[in-house]
Amino acid sequence: MIDLYTWPTPNGHKVHIMLEETGIPYRVHPVNIGAGEQFAPDFLKISPNNKMPAMVDSDGPGGKPISMFESGAMLIYLASKSGKFLPEDLAKKWSTLSWLMFQMGGVGPMLGQAHHFLGYAPEKIEYAMNRYKNEANRLYGVIERRLKESEYIGCDEYTIADMAIVPWLRYPDRQGVEIDEYPTLKKWRDKILERPAAKRGCEVLAERRRPGPHTDKEREILFGKTQYAKR
C-alpha cells in the first residue's frame, strides 16, 4: 500500500495519474500547503525539502518500507514497481527519461514561475512577467515540435514522461500562452486528459482546490518569510 502525501497541484497530479494508471493501491493524505502543513516535523521526515508530493511504500524493496520525495523519482519508482509506462527497450527508456528530466528541470520550474509572476506576485514586475511568459511559450514550442515527430513525448508509447508534463499544460492562460498556437500539443494534451485514469488522477482532492485568490496568511506561508525560515 502506498501512503501518498499530496495536494491538488500539477506535481501532485503527476503521481495521482500514475497510481490510477497502474492500479497500485494507495491512500491519500492531504498536505494543505496554504496552511503550512508541509512544514510539520512528521512530513519533513518524508520530504526534507518541504515539498509535496511525497510517499511511503509499506512494501518497498525487499518488503521493507521506503519513503520518497520528488515527483520524478516517484514516477520512476512506480514504473519499476509496476513494470508499466517506462519501456524496457533501452532507446525508448532513455528517451523517456530525457523528456521526464525536461519536465523536472524546465517545464515545472519555468511554468511555476510564470504562474507566480503573472498571478500571485504582490506587484507586477514587467521584466519577470515577460521573462517567464516568453519561457513558457518557448517550452510549449519545444513540445509542439517534438510531437510533430512522435505520437507521445518520450517515444511512440504512453509513458511517465507524458504523465509528468500534461498536468502543467492544463492552465495555459495562467502562463501567458495561447494554446491554439500549439495545435499538435493541444491535441496530445487533450487525448491524455481524456484517459479515464488521468481524469481520476486530476480529480484527487479536487474539492480542496482554492476557488479564489490566496489570503494574506496563505501568501505569507507560500511565498513569504515562512517559506524561507530556517528549520
Indicate residue ranges for each PLM-predicted region.
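Acidic/histidine-enriched, glycine/proline-rich intrinsically disordered or flexible terminal extensions
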Residues: 205-231
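Generic structural signal for helix capping and beta-alpha/helix-loop junctions
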Residues: 36, 189, 209-210
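GST-like fold's C-terminal all-alpha helical module
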Residues: 78, 100-196, 231
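GST-like domain detector, emphasizing the conserved glutathione-binding G-site
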Residues: 1-130, 230-231
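Short, solvent-exposed turn/loop segments enriched in Gly/Ser/Thr/Pro and often Arg
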Residues: 32, 160, 205-208
